[in-house]
């Protein structure tokens, strides 16, 4: 959803940037990514965070910008980087996405949108669209339906996880032996992470 909105509205801003933060990050590396996305020339060998932050702040001064910080896990992130973003233009926007409500609990965010997980039948349609896009009927065979629902249950209604697993299975032979093998691999990966993550799914592929 955020990706769709971002690509739709970014032309209305002077500059736009999208950076995926993820669970483990370092401020210096994150600032370099932000600078690169905005097209700011910085010395990549320079790890002096104050200098990087000032360069970004000065560049954004007076500009109408949109900045998306995707997949934020740490509550400390916004306090660490809030001063990077110029507030001289009230039409600029900073958007953060997170799977943790506590990350976005600060009153500094004017709007919060909570996305509900997909309903079961919507998950099924999305899964089949990915898993069987190469077939003529684009439907799940009866002998794989029980396993298909097990995969869908693992995704907990998350669209990106459902779509990724569907696409992964589309590259595998469509038989229960192959699918069960993939399921076991995913099960061991998900056991290390309470919430399904696209990066974990890609590891299995």
Protein language model regions, located:
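Short loop or secondary-structure boundary microenvironments that flank
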Residues: 20-23, 71, 117, 155
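A conserved switch/coupling segment of P-loop NTPase cores
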Residues: 4-12, 50-118
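Post-nucleotide-binding-loop coupling segment downstream of the phosphate-binding loop, primarily
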Residues: 1-55
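Tryptophan-centered motif/residue detector
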Residues: 18, 73, 78, 124, ...
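Non-catalytic, charged helical/coil tracts that couple and regulate nucleotide-powered enzyme cores
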Residues: 34-46, 90-92, 100-205
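Loop/helix-junction capping segments adjacent to catalytic residues or to phosphate/diphosphate-binding pockets
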Residues: 24-28, 75, 121, 159
């Amino acid at each position: 959803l955020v990706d769709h909105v971002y690509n739709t509205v970014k032309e209305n801003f002077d500059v736009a940037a999208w950076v995926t933060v993820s669970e483990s990050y370092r401020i210096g590396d994150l600032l370099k990514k932000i600078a690169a996305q905005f097209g700011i020339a910085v010395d990549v060998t320079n790890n002096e965070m104050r200098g990087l932050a000032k360069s970004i702040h000065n560049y954004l001064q007076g500009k109408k910008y949109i900045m998306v910080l995707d997949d934020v896990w740490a509550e400390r992130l916004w306090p660490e980087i809030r001063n990077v973003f110029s507030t001289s233009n009230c039409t600029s926007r900073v958007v953060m996405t997170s799977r943790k409500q506590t990350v976005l609990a600060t009153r500094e965010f004017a709007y919060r949108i909570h996305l509900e997980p997909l309903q079961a039948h919507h998950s099924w349609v999305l899964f089949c669209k990915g898993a069987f896009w190469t077939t003529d009927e684009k439907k799940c065979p009866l002998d794989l339906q029980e396993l298909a629902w097990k995969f869908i249950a693992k995704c907990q209604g998350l669209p990106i996880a459902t779509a990724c697993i569907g696409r992964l299975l589309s590259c595998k032979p469509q038989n229960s032996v192959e699918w069960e093998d993939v399921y076991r691999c995913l099960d061991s990966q998900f056991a290390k992470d309470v919430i399904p993550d696209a990066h974990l799914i890609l590891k299995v592929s």
